[in-house]
Structure formats: C-alpha cells, structure tokens
C-alpha cells in the first residue's frame, strides 16, 4: 500500500483511477496472489485510513494466500483496526501454512480454543522466526507445541503481551517457559516474561540448562499479584543473576531488560566476576540506576577487563525491545 500512496503523490492524475482503493477492499491484490505460481514471500503493512467499510478488506487476500500454503515460507502482516469489522479469517487458516520459515504478526487477533488446538496439532518443521505481538502467550505456546524444533528466534514486546493476559499471566507464562524447553532446543533469541515465583524461577533455570544455543534474552519479571517492595525487586535481580551463572550459557552474548527488577552493586559485581570465562556480554536496559556513578565505574572496570562488550542505557523502550533488524 505504501507504493500506491507514493504513486498518487507523485502523479496527481493517477488519483482518480486509484482513489477507490481507499474506500473499498482491494481485491486486485487477491487476484495478483492467485496468479503467482510459486509465492514464497508475502508482507502486508497498512498505512492508510479506511472509511465506511462494510466488509473485511483482507478476507479475499487471506483466501488467496491459503491456496499458496504449499509454497509460502514468509508471512508478515500488520493490519489497522477498522471499526465494526472483526478480523477472523487469519486465525482460522493460520494452521495451514505449514511451510513457513518466518511468521510475523504485529496486531491483535483473538484465537478461540478450537483454533488454538489446531495450531497445537500443526507441525511447522521449517519455522525459524516467530514474532507475534499483542496477543496472549498461549498463542505462541500453541504454535511451538509441534513446531519448535527449528525455531531460532521467538520475539515480542513483553509489556504488550502482558497487557493482553487479563489475569492469566502467571499460568500462561509458566506454560510458555515449559513449551520452550520442551520444543525449542535450537532457540537463540528469546523474549521471556514471567512471574517472580519460586516455580517460575525453577522452570526458567531448567530452560537455560536445556537451551544451550541461547545468544540473547529479553527479560521481564512481572508480579501481577501485588506491588513489590524495592527489596523484593532487588531480590529478583539477585536470584536471576545466580541462575545465569549456574546455567553456564557459553553462547549468551546479550541481555536486555527494563526496570522491573534491579541488580544491586554487589550482586552485579559478583556476577561479572564469575562470568569471566564465558562470552563477552552486551547489556541493554532502560533502568536509569545504572547511570549512577558507582555503577558506571563498575561497568567501565569490566569493560576494560573484557567481560562487558557493551552496556547501553536508554529511556526508550523501543531501543531495548528486539527490532526487525535482527530478523
């Protein structure tokens, strides 16, 4: 759709012929998909406003894509919200795209229990990158149940996922951890939010010991049951660092986190001392505590030694989240 907008901008005389694309579903895209003999890559990114639509503008597109399931290995979609229209077809047919290597969905799609069961049954032998935003963890867990053997990257913005949980976060995050270590032995990049319960930490440590190829973690420890004290927040950070040391992740090169847990100066130094024989670490955080002088001195010390490769603080959550550059 971006190309169409640019065409109208640079060639005003084209507007009369193309303006209908803004007021009704674009069935021409569906026809274009239908004539492709070996369609492997499909990407849709909405950036226009739809007005007065009475039918789903994407239905015919998905029906056409469904017929290309035997060849399609890259699917990326971002749809804008359209008042009065529920997008339901993608959820119904997603389990049929068994050849996918990359699946990216940057929008909320509600999945019924029946649709989740279909996802669990589908085997995605070739799936390597899974990026689903604005959805519950059980959607991702369902996809990897029989399709995680080749997965190298499971990426999402943790806070957006947590916002969708509505009281099911503790249960779903625990199940998510288990599905990862049961089904994703090759995982390298992983977004992972979980509760600071003893059971969650135990399962997370098990994940780290099984998934030895991990290179990067985006971590969120979120207590949905109560507001934690500062002592509890530091305690979660200390437990996490001890787990990382015990896990002996020789390939781990990067840790990303926000400010939902903190490392005391003493715990961080102990961790870095014990990390000396492993890979150089890059650390990215939005927590301004690490801008304090005593933390900066400690970080610079271990940069000079060669244990820390890079330490970046940013108030922009978008710079801590994974972005599409690593896809």
Where are these regions (language model features)?
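The conserved beta-strand core of Leucine-Rich Repeat
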Residues: 1-327
